[in-house]
């Protein structure tokens, strides 16, 4: 694996596997258990995204997630900067409709990791200017979490990856079968919900995703080396 260094946060291992939580998709499986198993399987970023929870419950869950992820993976909180600060998370994932990246950077400081969901090359370039550390692009494929959304495909992944010097994280319908495709298109990682939450064995699911990404990542590096020879 390769390590990517930003100017503001610590070290982000690439290719990155981000597990986005959804306790409803997890069903009877305790979310804490699923998160821990996902980390054991290779998830190095956990994004807490439980938008229906009131602040007190989200904070309590965030504290538990921080305990599980400490010294094991990065922890991001979706949208809620107050919860990021309250539970000591590593940063925030900002949705397209969320606060401006520059405001989040001002609130959380220069050491926080900030991801930004972007729909276009122009938005990705603006996210970089405003202080984002990575951009999230999708849905790449059809996904049950956003059934009405039109998939953007791997072409947009490639275009954004070639336009900004930030890691591009692909989301939406990612599985072990297509994870390599998005990595070869230029993504620096993937973010998944149901591929792990809905799996009978979350650890095995994470391992399969990690393996698929790793193989495609090595292929990319070899192609780059040959091109530069």
Question: Where in the sequence are the language-model features?
Answer:
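Conserved N-terminal beta1-alpha1 strand-loop-helix module at the mouth
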Residues: 1-101, 106-134, 149-152, 159, ...
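Flexible, gly/ser-rich surface segments that form the specificity/activation loops bordering the active-site cleft
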Residues: 138
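Juxtamembrane interface at the ends
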Residues: 144-147
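Short, glycine/charged-rich "phosphate-handling" switch motifs in NTP-dependent
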Residues: 188
């Amino acid at each position: 694996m390769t390590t990517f260094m930003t100017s503001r946060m610590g070290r982000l291992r690439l290719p990155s596997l981000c597990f986005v939580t959804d306790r409803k998709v997890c069903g009877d499986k305790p979310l804490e258990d699923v998160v821990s198993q996902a980390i054991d399987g290779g998830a190095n970023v956990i994004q807490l995204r439980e938008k229906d929870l009131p602040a007190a419950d989200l904070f309590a869950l965030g504290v538990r997630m921080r305990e599980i992820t400490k010294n094991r993976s990065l922890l991001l909180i979706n949208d809620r900067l107050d919860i990021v600060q309250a539970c000591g998370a590593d940063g925030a994932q900002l949705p397209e409709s969320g606060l401006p990246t520059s405001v989040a950077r001002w609130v959380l400081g220069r050491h926080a990791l900030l991801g930004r969901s972007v729909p276009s090359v122009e938005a990705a370039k603006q996210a970089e200017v405003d202080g984002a550390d990575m951009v999230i692009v999708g849905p790449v494929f059809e996904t049950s979490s956003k059934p009405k959304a039109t998939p953007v495909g791997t072409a947009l992944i490639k275009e954004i990856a070639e336009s900004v010097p930030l890691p591009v994280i692909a989301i939406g319908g990612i599985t072990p079968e297509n994870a390599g495709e998005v990595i070869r298109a230029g993504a620096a990682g993937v973010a998944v919900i149901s591929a792990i939450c809905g799996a009978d064995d979350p650890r095995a699911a994470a391992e399969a995703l990690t393996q698929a990404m790793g193989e495609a990542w090595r292929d990319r590096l070899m192609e780059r080396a040959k091109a530069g020879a």
